[in-house]
Amino acid sequence: MVDMGGLDNLIANTAYLQARKSSDADSKELQRRRRSLMLPGPQSCEQLRQALATDFHSLCEQQPIGRRLFRDFLATVPAYQEARGFLEEVQSWELAEEGPAKGSALQGLVTTCAAAPVPGRPHPFFSPALVTKCQAATTDDDRASLVELAKAEVMAFLQDQPFREFLASPFYDKFLQWKVFEMQPVSDKYFEEFRVLGKGGFGEVCAVQVKNTGKMYACKKLDKKRLKKKNGEKMALLEKEILERVSSPFIVSLAYAFESKSHLCLVMSLMNGGDLKFHIYSVGEPGLDMSRVIFYSAQITCGVLHLHSLGIVYRDMKPENVLLDDLGNCRLSDLGLAVQIQDGKPITQRAGTNGYMAPEILMEKASYSYPVDWFAMGCSIYEMVAGRTPFRDYKEKVSKEDLKQRTLKEEVRFQHSNFTEEAKDICRLFLAKTPEQRLGSREKSDDPRKHHFFKTINFPRLEAGLVEPPFVPDPSVVYAKDINEIDDFSEVRGVEFDDNDKQFFQRFATGAVPIAWQEEIIETGPFAELNDPNRPAGCGEGSSRSGVCLLL
């Protein structure tokens, strides 16, 4: 007899894996769609030109297309190109591994700054005072401080006349064309949908592929009726707004937010490597090698620090919410419980997952703030090492009240042989019962990255993506439940939508998120293709009257 569930899973997995392999613009259908694309004409950009804030940091540093076009503009003026080249050399020095080569690079930067300008003509971007100080520098500490000053002077220079000239140049006109293109409406027709990856309280997560770029994403589909029935609209909007704000390589990024007839959809980074809970318990003996524990903990710490820098408390830090990408790097996911701190006021609402909640969350009428994430971090490091959480053994049946009392009263014990002294110490500090004694919260400058547990991690290189992960997921494996193991939802009856609901849906469905969308356009090829001056003119079949070919 044929196992239809197994057959359905095989078919879904095969289509999904094939889509992942073909996401590099090699299919004929994708090439045909690409040929139909065309940027809007300059005349359609005038309204945006008047409305768009001309902020240097946003236009030339944060937004990938703006950064690329500003770089191309600088290359047209020798002095501007020289300034850009200096900043690139500074970045290379900052990210270099410690050693003689880094020292030589520092000396070279100071020599560049100390070079005497042409008599009677001041240096275009270094002040006379800086040049004099660089000429007199004798120690590496002095040189490093002077390079930081030089970097600041070059940035100030670029933000002045070069930026004004950029705004009046064809390069900025091109940027506006891309911004108009970015603002086109997005619907479910924009994507090809593949297998379901999982389900949550309000809907399912499935794999999708952008039809015109081949980029794969995860789409979190929130059932509109289920959201309304369970009063989940506010939480869904908060998660969406938080995802829009975050910009970290260690947190899943939001690329699109749109609505279909039945769902509100969040399109986010697709993490093909599975979650850390799977890797802890389902691959070999419970627990992970210490090299992986340190690497993942370092990336998670960077992600949590980024959230805290934005005034956000995560509240759901646990291995199940940490996902691996194709290369083996990890990101925090599921920000559904994350909350924005308002005016520095602590939180009182209880939220989190049993076994990872800090004592101050569990205590009656207690308030809490950022330190709860560091307690959960301690639980997660412990679990990665030992294959169990600090206060409950794996699969141990224990009541919520017993687990609460253990968390409040018991001291953590380290019985697993894999614990190093550094791992024990960082877990003890993260798992301190009171927030004031907890690592990351003892004082304003208390940075967990400085703990000796991370002595092998070069954090600037880690944040730049230059540290090789200790484990790379198998690209031929689907790290997700079989589709027949994912329960279906029952139909929600008796829910009708009014004008307030429709306004909420429109507020949620804002389309493409600029940074993620621009990264996709550059990464998958349309940026180079549509900017190519030798590309044949004309939009082909299906062009719109505005001159923009919609990505349908």
From Swiss-Prot:
ATP binds at residues 197-205, 220. Transmembrane segments: none annotated. Inhibited by phosphorylation of Ser-36. Residues 455-520 form the AGC-kinase C-terminal domain. The active site is at residue 316. Gene3D superfamilies: Phosphorylase Kinase, domain 1, Regulator of G-protein Signalling 4, domain 2, Transferase(Phosphotransferase) domain 1. It catalyses: L-threonyl-[rhodopsin] + ATP = O-phospho-L-threonyl-[rhodopsin] + ADP + H(+); L-seryl-[rhodopsin] + ATP = O-phospho-L-seryl-[rhodopsin] + ADP + H(+). Its EC number is 2.7.11.14. Residues 191-454 form the Protein kinase domain. One of its GO terms (biological process) is signal transduction. Residues 550-552 form a propeptide. Residues 56-176 form the RGS domain. It is a lipid-anchor. The modification Cysteine methyl ester is found at residue 549. Keywords: ATP-binding, Kinase, Lipoprotein, Membrane, Methylation, Nucleotide-binding, Phosphoprotein, Prenylation, Sensory transduction, Serine/threonine-protein kinase, Transferase, Vision. Disulfide bonds: none annotated. A lipid is attached at residue 549 (S-geranylgeranyl cysteine). GO terms for molecular function: ATP binding; rhodopsin kinase activity. It is found in: Membrane. The modification Phosphoserine is found at residue 36. Interacts (when prenylated) with PDE6D; this promotes release from membranes. Belongs to the protein kinase superfamily. AGC Ser/Thr protein kinase family. GPRK subfamily. Although the protein is present in a diversity of vertebrates ranging from bony fish to mammals, the mouse and rat orthologous proteins do not exist. PANTHER family: G PROTEIN-COUPLED RECEPTOR KINASE/RIBOSOMAL PROTEIN S6 KINASE, RHODOPSIN KINASE GRK7. This is Rhodopsin kinase GRK7. It comes from Bos taurus.
